[in-house]
Amino acid sequence: MMILVVDIIKGMQTQTAECLIIGEITCKHMIVVLNKIDLLPPEKRGVMIEKMTKRMKNTLANTVFKDAPVVSISAKSGGDSDLNSSSVGIEELIETLKQYAYVPTRGTSEPFLFAVDHCFSIRGQGTVMTGTVLQGSVNVNDAIEIPSMQVTKKVKTMQMFRQPVEQASQGDRLGICVTQFDPKLLERGLVCCPGYITNIHAAIISAQKIRYFKSSVKSKMKFHISVGYETVMAKVSVFGLMENDKSCEKSDDRGDSFSFQQIYKYQDELLSDESDSTKQIEKELPLKQYVLLEFEKPILASSRSLVIGSKLDIDINSNSCRIAFWGKMLERIVDKNYSTAVLPKLKVYKDKCKTGIVDRIKNANEVIGKDIFKKETNIQLFVGLKVNLSTGEEGVIDGAFGQSGKINIRIPGGLKDTTISQINQGSKKKGKNVAVQDDGNDTGPVKFTVAFKRYAYDPEKRMIQL
């Protein structure tokens, strides 16, 4: 559960909206607190509180917090306030908290992960790390690792709310005492069971675009990526699993799984299924969307970490949302040489299409094509690829014809009589404007296309026709 505190005088500000977005990503329950009601004119206070409450309800109507309660308070009334108490509405807030508080589902089966928010020493005892257990459990005498320091320590003692405990699990606020560790080396960070967290150089995440982010999330752009306590710059590459791909495994999952065995389509940008723009409608929305993150420097991250991408260099006073996308970390890439060791395994294709013109006929089953390749192109790479003529015939590239970039195209089913006539007429009219006959038959040049896929990370740049 989260509490969203709003200055009733200023209303929703950019940072308030961003807190709301982060809240939607991280939890499903919220209480809105309208603070500083003591600053409202006494004679208009009731009306203005009601007006702001209604405005907040309208703001939350299209979010997961549409039923969130709104409580108005004065946490600390000013000296000139007409309010008799130093604070107003706190009791109502406490009662609201009691009403909406719930015990979340907890588990202990996952590896231990602990978020440290403070570190200090106690003379004669050791170093205490205070924080929250994010997942799993820990016991006294367990071995724990401080991955940022690559140091393993033994849990000496533990306390919760000043009371000694032998065991703690997910959700607990905890103090862990270890020996022979300088607290100055760790202020905030992660602690885990040995070997659970390592430095990563890249990652693949599930991805969802934030609908309030006005700009595009385009491949090759750089964003600020927040994972745990760290925020670093990373280059993004967007790709998706298309529903019509033959390799697509039918699943109700919306992006929480990833397989290097699947074939994915490269995307110029991250799409949103909540957008109604014309630009959006023209594009096919993938069944699932992913982002490859290539970090400028290594970061520590656990499996299934929450990842948030932002443009923090946008002026906070510009009244624009800076949070661009979010997702879950599905694949951590630890190899420093991932571009050659890992990425070639990633089957992300780009649709390619080349168009040329039939130059002339060799025989009823062969034609010469031109205006598709440069003379320095290695045409041998394209041999065997299927070709479609604009007149309907299908063919195959047999090889190069001469040294000027022309190619031999074999038509297994043979050319139609109308196609032969059209090619011959086009050959006679080289250099002249092509016309359309009175009977409607096109006498222009016969074109052909070669459609294929190329894997973006294939070092050999091979072409594939599925």
Task: Spell out what each predicted region is.
Residues T16-A17, P41-V47, S81-S87, V128, ...:
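Short acidic, glycine/serine/threonine-rich loops at helix termini
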Residues L39-S121:
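Canonical P-loop GTPase G-domain recognition
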Residues G124-L466:
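C-terminal effector/interaction modules appended to NTPase cores
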